[in-house]
Amino acid sequence: MQNDTRLGPLKDARVRAVIERLVEARRIPSSGSPSDHPEVSRDPFDYAEYGFSIWPDQGDLLYLLCRGMRATRVVDFATSIGMSAVYFAAAMRDNGGGIVIGSELVPEKVKTARRNLADAGLADYADIREGDARQTLSDAGGPVDFALIDGWPNGQEPSLAREVIEILAPQIRTGGYVMNDNAEPDFLQFVRDPANGFISVTLPLKRGTELCVKVS
């Protein structure tokens, strides 16, 4: 049951309530998602009212991996309205402390994400940075344990996912994870090149989720 969080690993009622609210409120523009319909606008500001987020099964996996590795510093690109940030921040809190460094370009979504984190009781575990991730994520402040790269499909190369993984790769510690939701070809090319220090696998979550581990 892809959209059902009742059987997931999160037990905190406030956190679950926020996630369930975001799932129930999820909607797709009448013109379709820009990742599926290349003919529609790809300007992220045209979608300020829409939260393009991970699905709960992806979030459950993200949470479990962060708990298992005792992650304390994670990166969330792009934060959108905060669904993935809530999963990350819950793991940071339950690990005993840590920080989610989020990046979101659209100011309205930054405000919404911060509000959702506060509603979940997790605001103290998140630093949501407003602006272009190519600048906001240039310094994560220390070794990164986990990075979600779920950025905007700009329809060109290099994709934002490729640019962001190139920025983050030197900051991700050996043994750290990267999850990607959109399977941008040039992102996959980067993480599947052994010279870049990653190994990866495509998981049958959503329409295909790439999970990568930095091994060198």
For every predicted segment, state its role.
Residues 1-146, 154-179, 183-216:
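A short alpha-helical cap/connector motif
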Residues 150:
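Active-site residues of response regulator receiver
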